[in-house]
């Protein structure tokens, strides 16, 4: 049996099926498109789901893929096992071949057997097959093609060997291929009591999609039978590299060795588990970020954060004091970047996000671990950490629940899940109630029924501002009605065709008027449901509207033109950002309104003023060049080949609309645009800010709204001139003079404040409270700067050798603590310790400084009267 590299195995699998007339389909992103049932793509068939159900047609009937997959949330959550078992991963690659109504069982089994035994040269006596217990047909093909005797074909009665897409829909029996790693390894054949051992490992699963489940009692034959197969690349590589643990294959070993060279800790004993966790999680984090996910406190972003923080905690175990993950990224890009070029394109962005998140977490990791250690100090094996503490670790220190569980795993201490969930529910109750009342759902069954009955709405608005159409449906209070007669009532209207653009792709929907012989309707918004149905949000102004009557649809042309202007400007902005900031920039969201545009991008840091000017200048240059805006229909494949930018995670039909603006912008888009770039007029960025880690938001205005902005700025400038009694030529000089005078006054005020706090030696002796062998001056002050309080404390402690000075300041509902200690007694009392303890007492997070001077903060004003008692107890200790 030959030994292959991971890359060779992937390539050989794809080449084999391409040679057998399969179309090589690239891996889809890890984020499923329009599939709320899945958080992440977890198998090769996900991107073909609608093909199997007949909802989508592809220009091929056989396919081969190497699909990026991830299991770390929901039903498929392998996170807690990753690194500790031989085959659990968060990120993995699933090799697969698929047939959509072409070949079936016999050919699928032949392809698999031929590839394994001839191309990969696996010994035939090492292979076994399972079939569903009633699938005599598959068993007969295994006998015919592989020459298997009955004892090599294992019949399985459970649903492990029968697959279904859901309660209803396509389904069918499975056949799995198992490899025998040898009797030196514990484990039994599938179906035996020892089947969970590591000796017999499933390497390929074939699903024979031959039935459709109509209801719980009825299953019929599908008119076109299909094949869905999956082979885990990491498992297959372990077999072909003669190892029994996936983490021992070349790809993981290279990452682990690279990490070991950085950390200088040997890969042995308990450390090997941490190295495996880091290697696995590096892949998951990097591919998630490359596919557009960034760390956040909810949804996919929170799963990413959980994975990242678990890896960071294991880096901490290995003694890493500095951010580590981003240092490993170049090795991963070197290993996998050619196969998945998105890694190369987004490398700088991934690196920045990894580093930022690790820096952020390291600030709380130590404190969280300290709290966990204190809370479990008296817990023995079999004990349980309270849900309240687990929630505090989550809420205050950023510890995901499964990270806390992972830390306690080796000590056999459990976590009170119920208590944790109760704390979580209490915190989220208000948000949950708000969410439950959030409007109409675009996925209500009503809309599926409407689509099935009336089909898609034809959009006429690319070329027409006004058109006739037929009203096919009226909806009021989430129900279909035949007519609407109450004046000023709101309702939804659907037509067979319309020039109104339904909100999608970031572009707001049109407004306008609909008229029939019997009524006049104001359209206050236009939406798009299910991607196909254009829905007019209406108010009846006159008469009575009835279904099935003809109507005239007329958009507000001025409103639409401003939408066109800002939408086209968004395309130019996107293209220019690529030029100036880099190819890692991807669109994370947008809003095209009539008076402004908003554009969210993946970028690790704030744009500099110089970058903003460069972006504005380049966009305006393209506008002035007055390029023609061309729109062309072409295949998605041709569009991508020509370099058209597509929105991340967006799914496109086989034929797409491509919008081209000069040689700068080429983008897939279904929105409405200007005829020439000059129609935009001009472009001005109004703000740039962060909305999440690694996500920047740019807002801008175009055309007449730039003129409006200039006039507003001029008006503001004039008001300032009038207030300062100057003109624009002398304004800067006047402001600088005022600022200089302010600085002088602040210095004088600072001296005054310091003088008010200063005490002579005699005054100190008289006012200080004596505690044992030291003197204490404690003072509560209002609205004084921390710098002044620090200087005052230092001044006093230099005058007397046995003095402790504590100022507690109250400034805008925030508390500050300043502790000064004479150097002669810092061997007995530490200013940093006292400041930290007082901060914690006042609801702060601690603080610190030098033994002789330290500052910290607090927030609990109610405890102010008890601060002195707390201080005295610290000094008495």
Swiss-Prot record:
Its EC number is 6.1.1.7. Zn(2+) binds at residues 567, 571, 669, 673. Keywords: Aminoacyl-tRNA synthetase, ATP-binding, Cytoplasm, Ligase, Metal-binding, Nucleotide-binding, Protein biosynthesis, RNA-binding, tRNA-binding, Zinc. It holds the Pfam family tRNA-synt_2c. Binds 1 zinc ion per subunit. Its main location: cytoplasm. GO terms for biological process: alanyl-tRNA aminoacylation; negative regulation of DNA-templated transcription. Its cofactor is Zn(2+). SUPFAM superfamilies: Class II aaRS and biotin synthetases, Putative anticodon-binding domain of alanyl-tRNA synthetase (AlaRS), ThrRS/AlaRS common domain, Translation proteins. The keyword Transport does not apply. It is an enzyme of class 6 (ligase). GO terms for cellular component: cytosol. It catalyses: tRNA(Ala) + L-alanine + ATP = L-alanyl-tRNA(Ala) + AMP + diphosphate. The keyword Nucleotide-binding applies. It is found in: Cytoplasm. InterPro entries: aa-tRNA-synth_II/BPL/LPL (IPR045864), Ala-tRNA-lgiase_IIc (IPR002318), Ala-tRNA-ligase_IIc_anticod-bd (IPR018162), Ala-tRNA-synth_IIc_core (IPR018165), Ala-tRNA-synth_IIc_N (IPR018164), Ala-tRNA_ligase (IPR050058), Ala_tRNA_ligase_euk/bac (IPR023033), DHHA1_dom (IPR003156). Belongs to the class-II aminoacyl-tRNA synthetase family. Consists of three domains; the N-terminal catalytic domain, the editing domain and the C-terminal C-Ala domain. The editing domain removes incorrectly charged amino acids, while the C-Ala domain, along with tRNA(Ala), serves as a bridge to cooperatively bring together the editing and aminoacylation centers thus stimulating deacylation of misacylated tRNAs. Catalyzes the attachment of alanine to tRNA(Ala) in a two-step reaction: alanine is first activated by ATP to form Ala-AMP and then transferred to the acceptor end of tRNA(Ala). Also edits incorrectly charged Ser-tRNA(Ala) and Gly-tRNA(Ala) via its editing domain. This is Alanine--tRNA ligase. It comes from Rickettsia bellii (strain RML369-C). The gene is alaS.
């Amino acid at each position: 049996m030959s030994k292959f590299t991971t890359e060779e195995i992937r390539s050989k699998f794809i080449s084999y099926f391409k040679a057998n007339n399969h179309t090589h389909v690239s891996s889809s992103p890890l984020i499923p498109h329009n599939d709320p049932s899945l958080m992440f793509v977890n198998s090769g068939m996900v991107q073909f789901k609608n093909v199997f159900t007949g909802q989508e047609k592809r220009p091929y009937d056989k396919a081969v893929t190497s699909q990026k997959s991830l299991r770390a949330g929901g039903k498929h959550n392998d996170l807690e096992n990753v690194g500790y078992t031989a085959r659990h991963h968060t990120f993995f690659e699933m090799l697969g071949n698929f047939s959509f109504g072409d070949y079936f069982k016999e050919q699928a089994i032949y392809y698999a057997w031929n590839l394994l035994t001839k191309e990969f040269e696996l010994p035939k006596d090492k292979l076994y097959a399972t079939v569903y217990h009633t699938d005599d047909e598959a068993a007969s093909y295994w006998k015919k093609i592989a020459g298997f005797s009955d004892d090599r074909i294992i019949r399985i009665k459970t649903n492990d060997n029968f697959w279904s897409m859901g309660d209803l829909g396509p389904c069918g029996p499975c056949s799995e291929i198992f490899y025998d790693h040898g009797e030196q390894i514990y484990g039994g054949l599938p179906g035996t009591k020892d089947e969970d051992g590591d000796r017999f490992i499933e390497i390929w699963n074939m699903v024979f999609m031959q039935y459709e489940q109509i209801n719980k009692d009825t299953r019929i034959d599908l008119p076109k039978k299909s094949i869905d197969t999956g082979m885990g690349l990491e498992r297959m590589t372990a077999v072909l590299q003669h190892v029994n643990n996936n983490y021992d294959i070349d790809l993981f070993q290279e990452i682990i060795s690279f990490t070991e060279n950085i950390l200088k800790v040997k890969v042995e004993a308990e450390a090997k588990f941490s190295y495996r966790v880091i290697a696995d999680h590096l892949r998951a984090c990097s591919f998630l970020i490359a596919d557009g996910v960034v760390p956040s406190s909810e949804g996919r972003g929170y799963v990413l954060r959980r994975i990242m923080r678990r890896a960071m905690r294991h880096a901490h175990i290995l003694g890493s004091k500095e951010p580590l993950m981003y240092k490993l990224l170049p090795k991963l890009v070197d290993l996998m970047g050619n196969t998945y070029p998105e890694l190369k394109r987004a490398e700088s962005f991934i690196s920045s996000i990894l580093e930022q998140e690790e820096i952020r977490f390291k600030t709380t990791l130590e404190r969280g671990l300290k709290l966990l250690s204190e809370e479990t100090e008296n817990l023995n094996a079999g004990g349980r950490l309270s849900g309240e503490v687990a929630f505090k670790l989550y809420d205050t220190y950023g510890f995901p629940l499964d990270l806390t569980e992972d830390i306690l795993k080796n000590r056999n201490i459990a976590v009170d899940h119920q208590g944790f969930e109760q704390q979580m529910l209490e915190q989220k109750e208000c948000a949950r109630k708000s969410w439950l009342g959030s409007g109409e759902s675009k996925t209500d069954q009503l809309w599926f029924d409407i689509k099935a009955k009336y089909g898609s709405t034809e959009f006429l608005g690319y070329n027409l501002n006004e058109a006739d159409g037929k009203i096919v449906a009226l909806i009021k209070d989430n129900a279909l009605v035949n007519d609407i007669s109450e004046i000023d009532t709101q309702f939804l209207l659907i037509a067979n065709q319309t020039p109104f653009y339904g909100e999608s792709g970031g572009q707001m929907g049109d407004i306008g008027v609909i008229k029939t012989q019997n009524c006049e309707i104001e359209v206050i918004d236009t939406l798009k449901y299910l991607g196909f149905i254009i829905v007019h949000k209406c108010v009846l102004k006159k008469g009575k509207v009835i279904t099935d009557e003809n109507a005239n649809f007329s958009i507000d042309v001025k409103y639409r033109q401003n939408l066109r202007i800002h939408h086209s400007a968004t395309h130019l902005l996107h293209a220019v950002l690529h030029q100036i900031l880099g190819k890692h920039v991807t669109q994370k969201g947008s809003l095209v309104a009539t008076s402004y545009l908003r554009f969210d991008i993946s970028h690790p840091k704030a744009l500099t003023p110089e970058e903003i000017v460069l972006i504005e200048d380049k966009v305006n240059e393209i506008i002035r060049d007055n390029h023609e805006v061309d729109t062309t229909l072409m295949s998605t494949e041709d569009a991508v080949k020509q370099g058209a930018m597509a929105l991340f995670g967006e799914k496109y039909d086989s034929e797409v609309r491509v919008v081209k603006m000069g040689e700068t912008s080429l983008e897939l888009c279904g929105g409405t645009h200007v005829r020439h770039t000059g129609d935009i007029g001009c472009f001005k960025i109004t703000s740039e800010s962060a909305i999440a880690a690694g996500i920047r938001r740019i807002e801008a205005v175009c055309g007449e709204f730039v003129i409006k902005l200039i006039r507003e700025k001029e008006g503001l400038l004039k008001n300032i001139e009038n207030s300062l009694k100057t003109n624009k030529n002398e304004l800067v000089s006047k402001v600088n003079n005022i600022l200089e005078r302010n600085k002088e006054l602040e210095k004088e005020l600072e001296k005054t404040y310091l003088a008010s706090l200063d005490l002579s030696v005699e005054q100190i002796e008289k006012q200080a409270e004596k505690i044992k062998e030291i003197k204490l001056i404690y003072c509560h002050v209002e609205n004084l700067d921390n710098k002044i309080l620090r200087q005052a404390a230092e001044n006093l402690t230099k005058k007397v050798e046995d003095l402790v000075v504590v100022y507690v300041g109250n400034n805008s509902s925030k508390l500050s603590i300043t502790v000064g200690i004479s150097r002669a007694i810092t061997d007995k009392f530490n200013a940093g310790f006292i400041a930290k303890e007082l901060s914690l007492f006042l609801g702060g997070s601690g603080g610190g400084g030098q033994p002789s001077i330290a500052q910290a903060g607090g927030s609990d004003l109610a405890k102010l009267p008890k601060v002195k008692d707390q201080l005295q107890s610290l000094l008495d200790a």
